[in-house]
């Protein structure tokens, strides 16, 4: 039986009020990495931590998840807020 990995696009709310969008196969592990300062360069800055994972979307393929991440990163702040409201 094949054990398929799930792929996630996620959004963090940083301590400074900014959003960070990323990709992972393990959201809990990735959140721990971001909060410990070993995650993405963006979240390594102390002023951005701690971070809270405020959104996750599950995809079947890495390609779908990274496309969602790329699309989110192109949005303006206002558009990101609107996008997140559609899910919550």
UniProtKB/Swiss-Prot annotation:
It comes from the Bacteria. InterPro entries: GIY-YIG_endonuc (IPR000305), GIY-YIG_endonuc_sf (IPR035901), UPF0213_domain (IPR050190). Residues 5-82 form the GIY-YIG domain. It holds the Pfam family GIY-YIG. Belongs to the UPF0213 family. This is UPF0213 protein EF_2693. Signal peptide: none annotated. It comes from Enterococcus faecalis (strain ATCC 700802 / V583).
């Amino acid at each position: 039986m094949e054990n398929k990995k799930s792929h996630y696009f996620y959004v963090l709310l940083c301590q400074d009020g900014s959003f960070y969008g990323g990709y992972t196969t393990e959201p809990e592990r990735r959140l721990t990495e971001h909060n410990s300062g070993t995650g993405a360069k963006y979240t390594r800055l102390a002023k951005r931590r701690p971070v809270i994972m405020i959104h996750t979307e599950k995809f079947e393929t890495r390609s779908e998840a990274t496309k969602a991440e790329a699309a989110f990163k192109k949005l303006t702040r206002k558009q990101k807020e609107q996008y997140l409201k559609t899910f919550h």
